[in-house]
UniProtKB/Swiss-Prot annotation:
Entry keyword annotation includes Membrane: no
Entries under SUPFAM superfamilies matching the protein: S-adenosyl-L-methionine-dependent methyltransferases
Name of the featured protein: Ribosomal protein L11 methyltransferase
Catalysed transformations (reactions): L-lysyl-[protein] + 3 S-adenosyl-L-methionine = N(6),N(6),N(6)-trimethyl-L-lysyl-[protein] + 3 S-adenosyl-L-homocysteine + 3 H(+)
Protein source organism: Campylobacter hominis (strain ATCC BAA-381 / DSM 21671 / CCUG 45161 / LMG 19568 / NCTC 13146 / CH001A)
Gene: prmA
Binding site for S-adenosyl-L-methionine: T130, G151, D172, N239
Disulfide bridge map: none
Domain of life: Bacteria
Length: 301
């Protein structure tokens, strides 16, 4: 073990989840999530990682034609067994009927157990937007219904939906997130019914099973998927940044059955009215707010 290690704290007011996901694409194996940032530690210099984040910021700004906030601070610290220290600092959380915990913590018998290890996941339930999503799943998701998780990340929301009896489809534009969702579902003893790498409109691309194997290159060839979901869902949830929600607004609306529920989360308070305006053709049932983060519940028809 080297005498010192490097620490980098990364924060973004409007793209935190994207930078977290990108860190795993770069090969980062563990992060520590804080309220408004995340920390990366390594015994090797993190200069190349910093450069990659800055280039990723530029790419996001070009793609979404908007300013992407990014703050990076670095330090050198005396080495210690920080992985063990970090694990001890991660506490389970109770959200409605769900109990989200890392694998090294004990379960609670009276609650629905969800195991997510922050070291390998893009979301562990501690972030305000994910926390609100779990509360809304607890309240609005119905046993036997069909669900779509858009931007599944760690798979935490898909796992919650499966554990209360829904048929679940999930997608993410990041292949690392798809793989993480598959692994986390296996760890939790559930199977996401169908999962693909891409957005809502890419459901006709390669479909993966829980072993990560491609089932079909064409969704229309998969009769079980079509019979179960018909491309419209009783319950759709999207916990992603505002800019992506705005890009996907029509696809999100079209993916909800008449009388179905759409949950939008990952939205900063300053974009609250914009989201309400964009989805004004749906019935707004509820708005939750936790700190600067806002979640919306809409009903179609």
């Amino acid at each position: 073990m080297k005498k010192n290690y490097y620490e980098m704290e990364v924060s973004s007011k409007n793209a935190s989840e994207l930078f977290k996901n990108f860190s795993f694409e770069l090969g980062v194996e563990a992060i520590e999530e804080k309220e408004n940032s995340f920390i990366i530690r390594d015994e090797e210099d993190l200069q190349n990682l910093e450069f990659a984040f800055i280039e990723f910021q530029k790419a996001l700004q070009k793609k979404f034609n908007t300013k992407i906030d990014l703050q990076i601070s670095k330090s050198i610290k005396e080495n210690a067994d920080w992985i063990e220290k970090y694990q001890k600092s991660v506490e389970p959380i109770e959200v409605g009927k769900f109990y989200v915990r890392p694998s090294w913590k004990e379960s609670k018998k009276e609650l629905i157990d969800i195991i997510i290890d922050p070291a390998i996941a893009f979301g562990s339930g501690h972030h305000e937007s994910t926390n609100m999503c779990l509360k809304l799943i607890d309240k609005y998701a119905k046993d036997g219904a069909t669900a779509l998780d858009v931007g599944c990340g760690s798979g935490i929301l898909s796992i919650a939906l499966k554990k209360i009896g829904l048929k679940v489809a999930a997608c993410d534009t990041d292949i690392q997130a798809v793989d993480a969702s598959i692994k986390n579902a296996q760890k939790n003893g559930v199977k996401i019914d169908k999962i693909w790498n891409g957005s809502i409109a890419d459901a006709n691309l390669a479909i993966r099973n829980m072993d990560g194997e491609i089932l079909s290159e064409n969704l229309n060839e998969n009769k079980n998927f079509n019979q179960s979901f018909n491309k419209e869902f009783d319950f759709v949830i999207a916990n992603i940044i505002t800019d992506v929600i705005l890009i996907l607004q029509n696809e999100l609306k079209n993916s909800v059955k008449s009388g179905g529920i759409l949950i939008i989360s990952g939205i900063l308070e300053k974009y609250k009215n914009k989201i309400l305006n964009v989805f004004s053709d749906m019935n707004n049932l509820e708005i939750l707010q936790n700190g600067e983060w806002v979640s919306f519940v809409f009903k179609k028809g």
